[in-house]
Amino acid sequence: MDTRAIGFLDSGVGGLTVVCELIRQLPHEKIVYIGDSARAPYGPRPKKQIKEYTWELVNFLLTQNVKMIVFACNTATAVAWEEVKAALDIPVLGVILPGASAAIKSTTKGQVGVIGTPMTVASDIYRKKIQLLAPSVQVRSLACPKFVPIVESNEMCSSIAKKIVYDSLSPLVGKIDTLVLGCTHYPLLRPIIQNVMGPSVKLIDSGAECVRDISVLLNYFDINGNYHQKAVEHRFFTTANPEIFQEIASIWLKQKINVEHVTL
């Protein structure tokens, strides 16, 4: 048994979609979450800068004595996950491979779409992972740089959000049967995305898919939390306005949380 927390990092609030699923599946596990909303979005930034920012988030989580780190950010996973994983002696998990694997299982026509930040799409990592496991699957990737700012400003239900999603996704409509939400912010726009793509298109939440892998690693390294603990204390940190973070988090997690400001 290991009662230390699992650390989550993201460029902002998007990683809460992963946290929500973890709380549902593994309610006995403690969480420490750091969202770098002050510098979001990461997607348009140069690789070197993304690596620097990611390491700052990692080092912050290490000061919290976490037992595992989850990259709840596709951009950080694409750019820095392998380097961080090789450097640390605790498990480090990314969201891309679980999302790619789920897409392969989902598609019936071999037509998969991937939406993500400009950096994630430019890295071509989803196509590489999917076609490594299933070479016959066709992958269409599309950068959606306007989605993260919508979420970070808590405008997911606005008319402008609907227009941006519609305009952004139009190149994929009618061409795929499975769509990977290749950014953990995007599930917060899920109802609009589903409406645009149509009910027959299966949406894959890459962040939620990785919770299964978290459970596997906890068992493999024998670092599960206390199954009998009914109430666990989570900690949430943001580099931006805690009130905005708290507002979005409370809606998504369906509970009120305390959010602390941190300067990296």
Swiss-Prot record:
Q: Does the keyword Lyase apply?
A: no
Active site residues of this protein:
C73, C183
InterPro entries hit by this protein: Asp/Glu/hydantoin_racemase (IPR015942), Asp/Glu_race (IPR001920), Asp/Glu_racemase_AS_2 (IPR033134), Glu_race (IPR004391)
Its Gene Ontology biological processes?
Answer: cell wall organization; peptidoglycan biosynthetic process; regulation of cell shape
What EC number is given for this enzyme?
Answer: 5.1.1.3
- Functional pathway: Cell wall biogenesis; peptidoglycan biosynthesis
Recorded GO MF terms? glutamate racemase activity
Its keywords, alphabetically, are: Cell shape, Cell wall biogenesis/degradation, Isomerase, Peptidoglycan synthesis
Positions bound to substrate: D10, S11, Y42, G43, N74, T75, T184, H185
Query: Of which family is this protein a member?
Result: Belongs to the aspartate/glutamate racemases family.
Q: What does this protein do?
A: Provides the (R)-glutamate required for cell wall biosynthesis.
Q: Write down what this protein is called.
A: Glutamate racemase
Which source organism does the UniProt entry give? Streptococcus pyogenes serotype M2 (strain MGAS10270)
